[in-house]
């Protein structure tokens, strides 16, 4: 986790969702706009809140399945998006519907843009 600990007060718990790979229509280049050419995109996210007592049941936990379902159902259905930055902001807004969260990090990486191993990515770290 790459959060700057100096910005966090007290102890926190974190749920991470890693290596979610989707095929999305995203990009500004002509070849990225082709309807039959979806971009392979990886999403990694961390959601933090102040440390809670040990949970008595699942309802007291950060629901990573809610985040996963949103990414895997809503994003592929939304059609073409020019910028991964737009997707990152969208994820932050969705994650913060959980009012217990105090910090969210999302990193979106385009996996097949270049012919070599280079991978452009965009990251947001937002504190509430």
Label every PLM stretch briefly.
Residues 1-128:
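N-terminal, polar/charged subdomain of small-to-medium soluble alpha/beta proteins
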């Amino acid at each position: 986790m790459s959060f700057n600990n100096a910005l966090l007060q007290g102890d926190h718990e974190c749920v991470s969702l890693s290596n979610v790979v989707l095929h999305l229509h995203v990009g500004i280049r002509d070849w990225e706009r082709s309807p039959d050419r979806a971009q392979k995109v990886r999403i990694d996210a961390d959601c933090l809140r102040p440390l809670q007592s040990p949970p008595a049941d699942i309802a007291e936990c950060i629901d990573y399945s809610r985040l996963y379902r949103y990414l895997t159902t809503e994003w592929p259905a939304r059609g073409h998006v020019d910028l991964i930055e737009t997707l990152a902001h969208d994820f932050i807004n969705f994650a913060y519907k959980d009012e217990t969260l105090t910090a969210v990090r999302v990193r979106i990486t385009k996996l097949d843009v270049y012919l070599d191993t280079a991978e452009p990515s965009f990251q947001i770290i937002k504190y509430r």
